[in-house]
A protein has these predicted regions:
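A generic "structured core" feature
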Residues: 2-4, 62, 79, 106-109, ...
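Hydrophobic "anchor" residues on beta-strands that sit immediately upstream
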Residues: 1-2, 32
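Active-site pre-lysine segment of PLP-dependent enzymes
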Residues: 9-40
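Conserved glycine-rich beta-strand-loop-beta hairpin in the small C-terminal domain of fold type I
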Residues: 97-107, 118-132, 144, 163
Length: 196
């Protein structure tokens, strides 16, 4: 059997020791490792990669002709040069620092203005947070309110329940200096502030 590993946002881990990729621990050549540059460069580049175990490369070579490669050769060569010159690693370090600051600002603001009704889940990495919110409004309503002030959120029905609505909060797209004010406004619009 084969295991497909999508190491989503592994480059953007902010705290603690990074968890090694399953593929790096694989001694049986049964893990196919997938990755993308969408979070670390920009989504429009649409360059992804796949690391195959040696035993599977031959099979892949036989069927490769059935698939159309849609990624620009010029973009691939530019990215290769970018990596070779060390610019990619430098950029990752800068992104990691910026997103870490944005994450901390988001967590602080949610704690300050959420009045115990907002809990952030999985706060160690990435470009977004999953929020669990105790509110009379459902996740779709909360996301619609967020959208009205330009904040991108997505409802997560699978982990919402009768007591909490779950949604993904994309803090990465908010300028660092605006996070506190935006979260404060959002909590007020969501009517999570204590009534006076």
């Amino acid at each position: 059997s084969i295991i497909i590993e999508d190491d989503y946002d592994s480059e953007l881990r902010y705290f603690g020791k990074p968890v090694p990729a399953l593929q790096s621990l694989d001694s049986t050549d049964s893990v196919v490792y997938l990755g993308s540059f969408s979070s670390t460069l920009f989504p429009a580049i649409k360059i992804s990669y796949m690391v195959l175990p040696p035993a599977i490369i031959g099979i892949f070579d036989q069927i490769r002709g059935r698939y159309t490669q849609t990624c620009s050769k010029a973009e691939q060569l530019t990215l290769a040069l970018f990596m070779e010159k060390g610019f990619y690693n430098t950029g990752i370090k800068k992104l990691r620092n910026l997103y870490s600051q944005k994450l901390q600002a988001s967590l602080l603001a949610l704690s300050r203005y959420g009045h115990g009704k907002v809990k952030a889940v999985d706060t160690q990495s990435g470009i977004n947070l999953i929020l669990r919110i105790r509110s009379s409004k459902n996740a779709e309503e909360l996301c619609s309110i967020a959208k009205s002030i330009g904040v991108h959120m997505v409802p997560v029905a699978d982990i919402s329940d009768q007591e909490t609505s779950a949604l993904i909060f994309y803090y990465n797209s908010i300028p660092l200096k605006e996070i506190d004010g935006i979260v404060k406004a959002l909590m007020s619009l969501w009517e999570l502030a204590p009534q006076t």
